[in-house]
C-alpha cells in the first residue's frame, strides 16, 4: 500500500462523511412536518416512545442528533425523563438502519438482480436525478429531495472508494497485528469508543468498519467488541450537549450513556464467556458488510429488550447519580439545542407564541373588565401579563432570527417570518391592555365617570373588540383561513364604531353631558380599542399570508376583501350585531 492508496482512502472517507452529513440534514428538512407529528404523539406509553425514537433516527440517520434533540426537549420541559428514556432506546435501534443501507456495497455476484442492487449500478442514476432536482427545480422540498439523493450517492461513492483503497492493507503486517490486538474485548471496545467519540457518529464509524472489512483482516472476534465500543462513543455528543442544562436534561444524557455501558458490559461478558467455553469458529472468520450490520443490530436489539422493561429502574438509577437541586430549577423556554432540528425548534416557537397570545388575550380581557369594574388586583394582574408578553417577544424574536438564519425549508422559513410578524402584534395588544388599565385608574383617581349613553356605547365597542380578539387568535392557533377572512369585516365595523363614538362624544360635550376631562380619557380608550382591532387584523393577515406563501400583510388584508365573497354580507351582519341602537 503506497501514498496514493492512503490519499484515495482519505478522499473516500471525506466523501463518505460529507455525503452522510448532507443526506442527514436534507432528510431532516424534508421530513420536518413528519418530525413534528411524531413529537406530538409522544406519550408516557413506553412502546410508542420507543417507536418514535426509532422512526426519528431512521429518518435523520443519526442517533446522536436524536439524543441531543431529546436533551433539548427535556431541558425545555417538553418531555419528562421517563418519556426521554423510551425515545433514547428507540434511537439506539434506529441508528442501525444506516449500516444495512451501507451493506449493499458488499453485495457480490454477476446475476442481473445482484448487479442492479450494487451501489455502483444505481448511485450514478440517483446522482443524476438529484442534480436535476437541485439545479433546475425551484420548489424547496424538491431541492431537498435532490440533496438527499446527491448525499446518498456521495456517501455510497465514498464508501466504494474507501473500500477499494483499503484492500491493500491486507498485505500490511502491522494492520493484521492491529486487528489481532482488537480481538481483545477490552481493547476492541476502547478502540470503537474512541473512534466514534472523535467523529461523533456511530453510523459513520460502523460504516468505516464495514469498509475496513473489505481487507479480509477484520474478524468477528475484533468487529463485535469494536461495535460495542462504538455505541458507547456515540454518547459523547449528548453528554457535551447537556452541559449547562437542567438536572433532568443531564439525566437524559446520562441515561444514553448508562444504557450503552450496561448493555456493553452484559454483552461483553456473555461474549467473553461464550468465546472461552465454546470457541465459536465464526469468531475467526472475516467479517463482512452484512455480518457487521447483523452484529450492530443484534447488539442494540438485545440491549433494548433487556433494558426497555426496566426503564423505571434506569430512571431511578440516574436520579440517584444526579440528585435533585435544593431549589426548583427554571425550565428553559427555548433551548438552543433544538436549533439542530429546525422544524422542531419552529414548532416550539409556535407553541410559545400561542402561550403569548393567551397571555395577551387574558390581559386585554382584564383591561376591558377594569373599565367596567376597576380593582387594584386587576391592575396588578394586567401589568404582570404585559411584562410577560414583553418577555415572550424578547426571547422568541431573538430565537426566530437565529432559526431563520439556518438552512431551513421554504415552508419553515415562511412560518418563521409569520411568527416574527405576529409577535409584535401580540405584544402591542398587551400594551393596549395596559393603556386601558391606566385609563381606568385615571377615572378612579379623579372620580370621573361616563354618562349612561357613553357607557352603553363603550359596552358595544368592547364586545366587538372581544370578538375580534377571539376570532383572530383562534385563526392563528388553528391556521384557520375561514376565521381569518372573517376578521377584516369586523375590523371595519370597529373602525366605524370608533368614529361614531368620537362624534357622539363631541355632541355630548356640546350639550354639556360630558366633561373635557372625561373626554381625554374617552379618546385614549377609543384609540386603544381601535388599535387592538388593527393588530387583530394584522394577525389574521399573517395567517392569510402563510396560506398564500406571500408575507405581504397589507396585500393579504386587501385580498381578504377581494377574495372573501361574503365580505359585504359579513360586514352588514357585524354592523347589525354591534349596532348602537338601544
Q: Residue spans of the language-model regions?
A:
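Alpha-helical transmembrane segments of multi-pass membrane proteins, especially transporters
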Residues: 13, 33, 37, 41, ...
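Helix-loop-helix hairpins and the membrane-proximal interhelical loops
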Residues: 1-46, 145-194, 212-215
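Alpha-helical transmembrane segments and their lipid-water interface positions
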Residues: 15, 28, 64-68, 95-102, ...
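Membrane-interfacial helix-loop connectors
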Residues: 69-91, 99-121, 196-233, 242-248, ...
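Cytosolic, long alpha-helical scaffolding segments
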Residues: 79, 105, 218, 244-250, ...
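Membrane-embedded alpha-helical segments of transport systems
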Residues: 59-66, 85-102, 119-125, 155, ...
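Hydrophobic core segments of alpha-helical transmembrane domains in multi-pass membrane transport
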Residues: 9-22, 53-57, 125-137, 150-162, ...
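Short helix-coil transition sites and intra-membrane helix breaks within transmembrane domains
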Residues: 24-28, 56-65, 166-167, 195-204, ...
Amino acid at each position: 500500500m503506497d501514498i496514493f492508496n492512503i490519499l484515495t482512502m482519505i478522499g473516500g472517507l471525506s466523501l463518505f462523511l460529507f455525503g452522510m452529513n448532507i443526506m442527514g440534514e436534507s432528510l431532516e428538512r424534508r421530513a420536518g412536518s413528519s418530525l413534528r407529528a411524531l413529537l406530538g404523539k409522544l406519550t408516557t406509553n413506553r412502546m410508542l416512545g420507543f417507536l418514535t425514537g426509532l422512526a426519528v433516527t431512521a429518518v435523520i440517520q443519526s442517533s446522536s442528533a436524536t439524543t441531543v434533540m431529546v436533551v433539548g426537549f427535556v431541558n425545555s420541559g417538553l418531555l419528562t425523563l421517563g418519556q426521554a428514556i423510551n425515545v433514547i432506546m428507540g434511537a439506539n435501534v434506529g441508528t442501525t438502519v444506516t449500516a444495512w443501507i451501507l451493506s449493499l456495497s458488499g453485495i457480490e455476484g454477476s446475476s442481473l438482480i445482484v448487479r442492479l442492487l450494487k451501489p455502483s449500478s444505481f448511485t450514478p442514476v440517483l446522482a443524476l436525478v438529484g442534480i436535476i432536482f437541485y439545479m433546475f427545480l425551484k420548489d424547496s422540498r424538491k431541492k431537498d429531495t435532490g440533496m438527499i439523493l446527491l448525499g446518498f450517492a456521495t456517501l455510497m461513492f465514498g464508501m466504494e472508494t474507501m473500500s477499494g483503497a483499503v484492500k491493500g492493507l491486507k498485505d500490511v503486517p502491522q494492520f493484521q497485528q492491529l486487528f489481532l490486538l482488537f480481538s481483545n474485548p477490552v481493547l476492541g471496545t476502547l478502540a470503537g469508543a474512541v473512534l466514534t467519540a472523535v467523529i461523533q457518529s456511530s453510523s459513520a464509524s460502523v460504516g468505516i468498519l464495514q469498509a475496513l472489512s473489505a481487507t479480509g483482516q477484520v474478524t468477528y472476534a475484533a468487529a463485535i467488541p469494536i461495535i460495542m465500543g462504538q455505541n458507547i462513543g456515540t454518547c459523547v455528543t449528548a453528554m457535551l450537549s447537556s452541559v449547562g442544562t437542567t438536572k433532568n436534561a443531564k439525566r437524559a444524557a446520562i441515561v444514553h450513556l448508562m444504557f450503552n455501558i450496561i448493555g456493553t458490559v452484559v454483552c461483553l461478558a456473555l461474549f467473553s464467556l461464550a468465546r472461552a467455553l465454546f470457541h465459536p469458529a465464526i469468531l475467526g472468520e472475516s467479517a463482512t458488510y452484512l455480518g457487521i450490520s447483523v452484529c450492530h443490530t443484534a447488539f442494540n436489539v438485545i440491549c433494548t429488550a433487556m433494558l426497555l422493561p426496566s426503564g423505571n429502574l434506569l430512571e431511578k438509577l440516574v436520579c440517584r447519580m444526579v440528585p435533585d437541586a435544593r431549589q426548583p430549577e427554571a425550565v428553559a423556554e427555548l433551548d438552543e439545542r433544538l436549533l439542530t432540528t429546525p422544524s422542531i425548534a419552529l414548532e416550539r416557537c409556535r407553541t410559545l407564541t400561542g402561550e403569548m397570545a393567551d397571555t395577551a388575550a387574558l390581559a386585554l380581557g382584564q383591561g376591558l373588565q377594569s373599565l367596567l369594574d376597576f380593582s387594584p388586583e386587576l391592575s396588578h394582574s394586567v401589568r404582570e401579563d404585559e411584562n410577560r408578553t414583553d418577555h415572550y417577544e424578547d426571547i422568541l424574536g431573538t430565537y426566530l432570527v437565529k432559526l431563520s438564519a439556518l438552512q431551513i425549508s421554504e415552508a419553515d422559513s415562511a412560518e418563521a417570518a409569520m411568527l416574527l410578524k405576529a409577535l409584535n402584534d401580540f405584544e402591542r395588544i398587551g400594551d393596549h391592555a395596559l393603556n386601558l388599565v391606566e385609563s381606568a385608574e385615571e377615572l378612579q383617581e379623579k372620580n370621573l365617570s361616563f354618562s349612561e349613553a357613553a357607557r352603553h356605547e363603550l359596552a358595544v365597542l368592547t364586545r366587538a373588540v372581544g370578538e375580534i380578539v377571539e376570532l383572530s387568535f383562534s385563526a392563528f392557533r388553528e391556521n384557520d383561513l375561514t376565521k381569518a377572512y372573517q376578521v377584516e369585516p369586523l375590523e371595519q365595523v370597529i373602525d366605524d364604531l370608533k368614529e361614531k363614538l368620537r362624534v357622539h362624544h363631541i355632541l355630548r360635550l356640546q350639550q354639556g353631558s360630558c366633561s373635557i376631562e372625561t373626554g381625554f380619557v374617552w379618546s385614549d380608550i377609543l384609540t386603544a380599542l381601535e388599535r387592538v382591532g388593527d393588530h387583530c387584523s394584522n394577525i389574521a393577515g399573517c395567517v392569510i399570508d402563510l396560506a398564500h406563501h406571500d408575507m405581504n400583510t397589507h396585500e393579504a388584508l386587501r385580498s381578504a376583501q377581494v377574495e372573501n365573497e361574503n365580505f359585504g354580507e359579513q360586514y352588514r351582519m357585524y354592523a347589525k350585531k354591534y349596532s348602537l341602537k338601544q
